[in-house]
Amino acid sequence: MASSNSSGTETLATGFSLTGITDPGELRDTAQALDEAGVGFVSLSGHILSAAAGRYPDRPTPTYASTYRDPFVVFSFLAAHTKRLRFRTAILILPLYPAALVARQTADLAVVSGGRLELGVGISWQQAEYAALGQETRGRGVRMEEQIGVLREFWGGSLISLRGRFHEVDGLGIGEQPPPIPVLIGCGQADPLLERVARIADGWLPLGGISEAGPIERLRKLTADAGRDPGAMRVGSRLAVAPEDPDAWLAGARAQHHIGVTDLTLQPPPGTSRDDALSAVLAAHAAITASPAISPDTEA
């Protein structure tokens, strides 16, 4: 059983981002090593298209010049090669997709993975990607909110009929009720954004991670105000795990756990070799596991 931190939340679940790894064999081998070590989850970006490096000089983070593997395809592949590892989109740009298609894809992935899917969603600022896919950027936040409701209706397994601002469904369904699919929203810390998370999401993925307790405390209060259990709200963040600085791993993990973080993505510095990055992640996970106050819930 997982213990609780000072905020009443579950102990840390550790994870690793696979974004940037494109070779199928390397994806498989990395996922298997993480799975065997008891790491809780892996994540992949949900962007569809790449841009030229340096296209957005006013944006210090990310350039969108990477090759993006489709997370539903990759996770289906990895599900066949792992046993416990959970799969998280971080983040799927939900307004780029038809909600009915995502309902189908996520339900199938939840089934074939044995209930190991977590759907992290967000809206992005990359207007060119929206335009290329025939979608509007205006109103994408409220559209995403409606999409989440539509997804949950489809996941109920029955034929549904609904008419919303952006969606109309007349007596259609996906034909089954998949295992539960947690929905986490990636966004900033403004109160309207946290209020949306509190009302409709199962977790929050703060953009760029988080280092202070204040926003998490606000989120938990908003969650309680919405009539939901604040202790069940998951909160993600990131922890730098430089191979040459293992002493900082536990201190950083303890600090994140203390402010209420529940899900910690272990992140080697840019430029670290693949082998060194994996070794650092596995070593950091082992160190966190060995610390009783912050040991991960490996059953998650």
Question: What kind of region is each of these model predictions?
Answer:
Residues 1-300:
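Active-site-adjacent structural elements that line small-molecule/cofactor binding pockets in enzymes
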